[in-house]
A protein has these predicted regions:
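Secretory targeting signatures
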Residues: 1-25
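Ubiquitin-like/PB1-type beta-grasp interaction modules and other compact soluble beta-rich domains
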Residues: 20-158
Length: 158
C-alpha cells in the first residue's frame, strides 16, 4: 500500500473514532433519586398533576411524587424543590398547601446521613433524600422513602 493510502486510512479511522466518541458524549443524561419532604411529621404529597413535569431538567412524572427524574448533571435539591413550589432556607420551609413553617431549621438527610447543604446539595443517581422540618421520627421518615430509583438503575428510558 502506498503512503497516501495509509494516511487516508489513518485519518478515516481517526475521524470515525472521534465521531463515535462525540456521539457517546452527547447521550442524554437521565438518572433517578427518591425523596420525601416532611413538615411536622406529615409527608408532602407531590403526586398530583400540578407537580408533574414542571421543568425539563428535573421533575416528577407519571403521578409518582416520590421519584425525581434528573436530566442534567449538577442539578441541586433546591432547584428541584423550587420547581415543585417548595421554598427552603436555613430557618424556613414553605410547602404548597401546607404553607410556611419558620420556627426552626429544616434538616437534610441523604442516604441516611445528615447533610449541611440543604438546597445546595447536588442530587446523585439512586440517592434517598429526606428533607424534614419540625416534629417527627427521623428513622420512620427515612424508612418511608421508596427505592424506586434503585429499581430503575440502568433503565435510562424511564
Amino acid at each position: 500500500m502506498g503512503r497516501t493510502n495509509l494516511l487516508f486510512i489513518f485519518f478515516s479511522l481517526a475521524a470515525l473514532l472521534i465521531g463515535c466518541t462525540a456521539q457517546q458524549a452527547a447521550a442524554p443524561y437521565h438518572t433517578h433519586a427518591d425523596f420525601k419532604v416532611y413538615v411536622n411529621g406529615t409527608a408532602a404529597n407531590f403526586s398530583g398533576l400540578m407537580y408533574q413535569v414542571r421543568a425539563k431538567e428535573v421533575h416528577v412524572e407519571d403521578g409518582i411524587g416520590e421519584r425525581v427524574h434528573i436530566h442534567q448533571q449538577g442539578v441541586t435539591l433546591g432547584h428541584f424543590l423550587e420547581t415543585l413550589g417548595v421554598q427552603l432556607n436555613e430557618s424556613c420551609i414553605t410547602v404548597p398547601i401546607q404553607g410556611a413553617s419558620c420556627s426552626q431549621a429544616p434538616h437534610l438527610y441523604v442516604n441516611g446521613l445528615p447533610r449541611q447543604e440543604l438546597g445546595d446539595y447536588v442530587m446523585q443517581d439512586s440517592d434517598k433524600i429526606l428533607v424534614t422540618y419540625g416534629e417527627g421520627d427521623i428513622q420512620e421518615q427515612m424508612a418511608s422513602i421508596t427505592d424506586m430509583a434503585g429499581e430503575k438503575r440502568g433503565m435510562s428510558n424511564e
